[in-house]
Amino acid sequence: LTITDLQIPNYEHVASAEEDDYRGFVAIHSTKLGPAVGGTRFWKYENDEAAIRDLLRLARGMTYKNALAGIPFGGGKSIVLRPDGDIDREKIFRAHGRFVNTFGGQYITAED
C-alpha cells in the first residue's frame, strides 16, 4: 500500500493510497470534538481533481453535521475510486480498510 500525504489548507490530514486496482482518498477536516466520522463513497469520478473536490466538501460537511447533532465526533470522508471493468470488491475494500487503519482511530468510516 503506497500512501501519499496531500497538503490541503484548513484540513487536518488528507492522503491518497494505491495498491493494485485500489485507489482511494481520506480527508480529516476536524477532530476537535472527537475522531472524524464520515462514510466511504465508492464512485467513478471524471478525474482525481473532481474526486478530491468532492472529498473535501463532504469531509467539511461531516464536521458541521456532527457538531450540529451534538455528538462527540469530528468530520471526515473517504473515497474509493471505482475502477473500470470486472473488479474484486473484497480486495479493493480490504486495501481501503488497511489505509483507514493507518489513521490510528482518528477516522472512523462506514458505507456512504
Regions found by a protein language model. Give the residues of each.
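N-terminal ligand-binding/catalytic initiation module
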Residues: L1-D112
